Amino acid sequence: MRAEGRGQTRARRRSLAAQLSVPVRRYLNTEAGSAGLLLGATALALLWANSRWSGSYESLWSAQAAVSVSRWDLSMDLGHWVNDGLMALFFFVIGLEVRREFSVGELTDPRRAAIPVLAALGGLAVPALLYVAIAPGSAAHGWGVVIGTDTAFLLGALAVVGPTFATQLRIFLLTVTVIDDIVAVSVIGLFYSDSLDPAAIGVMAVFLVLMAALSRLGVWRAAPYVLAVLGLWIATVQSGLHASIAGMLGGLLVAAHSPTREAVEGAARRFRAFRQSPDVQVGRSARLGLAQAVSVNERLQAALHPWTSYLVVPLFALANAGVDLRDGVLGDALASRLTWAVVVALVLGKLAGIGLASVAGVRAGLGRLPRGVRLGHVFGGGALSGIGFTVALLIAGLAFESDQRDRATVGILIAAVLATGLGWAVFHAAAVLRGQTDADLPRFLDPPVDARHDHVRGREDAPLTLVEYGDFECPFCARATGVTTELRERFGDDLRYVFRHLPLVDVHPHAELAARAAVAADHQGRFWELHDLLFEHQGELEVEDLAGYAADLGLDVEAFLRDLEEDDTADRVRRDVASAEASGARGTPTFFVGGVRHTGPHDAETLARALEESRT
């Protein structure tokens, strides 16, 4: 138990990002890391625009650049190439992320998605209403400025002023910004686009149908999607719609899916073949097998997201944040109702809209907050959502002419500073007054191992403990049996291995029945023998199959089938599922080393290192 306690203390200091699934962890790390570059680009733009070289700043972004092919050419100034060209790539990546969330992420579960969706809608409606109520006259047209949230700045600010452990809050806020981005791009298309060209819109429709067909047909190579998106972007620019529409719609049409068992096993076979015969053709086959196993959506995200976060968004800030505040411009902005309409709508509107919509949704029973996230965290995240920046600057450039655009930009910059300070104050108050500190999944095994109730392999007093939450129909759990066997051979009597049931009934229809069968076999002292058989025959888990395995093991088949249907057997499985929820195990296999949830790879070498570390 002392080793478990020390392991828990060390685990509490680990990087929280390691607790996330790989795609979400990659997304968060890239966005949070780019926040520093974004801040630097903003500062550089302001310094440049207010220096003796301010003329060169204006000249740079007004310089013309063209792409010509035969008689066709597309000409824009550099500012528009950034706003209409590179930012379309940014919104394409956002569209990819939205599609992934709806297909395999947080938005697949209506109960889990309900509160973030309500929060996002509140965070859109309340700021817009506040802005319209405050803004003078024709400036009310710019209400779209206050609806967006800058994901990079939001996550960067959360890392600085938010809870130390905030995994679940980050995912919640990321889901909110996904809805935010969908609405923001829709608003740009509906309210801030130029006169429209019906012929070009027809060409857009052709490319959209083409992209939908590519996804429908399961085309796994990225090149056809890239070419279709390029054609869609050109048609959108010619149509008069803002190019961000092309990016978002294109991303939404690229299918996302989890790797199938067949694809993963096929890739593994090809890599084994490459190890045995490392020539060029076999290596190419192995590489293609891996590409086929991972959805084109995630491959495009992995390739493009660093570019948009570390290059496109900072370049956008450099091109758009440079407001010349000299000659009374700053004073005029501070005296303008437009400026303060932006500030109040972003700082107070986002806080109230996201926070109150979440409270209403929870109390109405429409959904629940993610485990570990409480309302104080939601209000703090709502405050930080007032950092509108990227989308706000983009819409300000579309909605206003020069003087009003400068005032709106000043308001956006002031709001970013105030929203960060308000977020810190809300998080601090929630921690001090309500005890709402961490906002992440539980990390410690709950309840601890009890040999009287758990399925235990090894000495009860062994110095090392490895607990696995598994599903008998999960192919990844089946492969993990080889890992646990290797670990038991390596550590011998020093290792106690525990198996707990976590049947994922939504995706594995026979998993719960198989778990009950294993418990029924345990009543006759043959749990581990049936455990091994079930993983060897994952495709054959009907009642007749289970009875056959029981007979092969020499069990009393009648007693086995009777126990299979007993409430006590089902309760035993449900207790393990409840302990998985209490321990923060959301998928299979999930391992606990020394009572602490293991994050990252679960190959034999990685788990062996973690077990050795838990000794001291």
Swiss-Prot record:
A single MF term (Gene Ontology): sodium:proton antiporter activity
GO biological process, one term: regulation of pH
Subcellular compartments: Cell membrane
Residues in Thioredoxin domain copies: 435-616
Family matches, as SUPFAM superfamilies: Thioredoxin-like
Transmembrane residue ranges: 28-48, 78-98, 114-134, 142-162, 171-191, 200-220, 226-246, 303-323, 342-362, 378-398, 412-432
Highest taxon listed in the record's lineage: Bacteria
Entry-linked PROSITE patterns: THIOREDOXIN_2
A matching Pfam family: Thioredoxin_4
Positions of the UniProt region annotated as Na(+)/H(+) antiporter NhaA: 1-434
Annotated keywords: Antiport, Cell membrane, Ion transport, Membrane, Sodium, Sodium transport, Transmembrane, Transmembrane helix, Transport
GO cellular component: plasma membrane
Topology class, membrane: Multi-pass membrane protein
Catalytic activity: Na(+)(in) + 2 H(+)(out) = Na(+)(out) + 2 H(+)(in)
Predominant subcellular localization, coarse grouping: membrane
Similarity-based family: In the N-terminal section; belongs to the NhaA Na(+)/H(+) (TC 2.A.33) antiporter family.
HAMAP family: NhaA
Listed PANTHER family: NA(+)_H(+) ANTIPORTER NHAA (PTHR30341:SF0), SODIUM ION/PROTON ANTIPORTER NHAA-RELATED (PTHR30341)
Known role: Na(+)/H(+) antiporter that extrudes sodium in exchange for external protons.
Protein's recorded name: Na(+)/H(+) antiporter NhaA 2
Lineage: Bacteria, Bacillati, Actinomycetota, Actinomycetes, Propionibacteriales
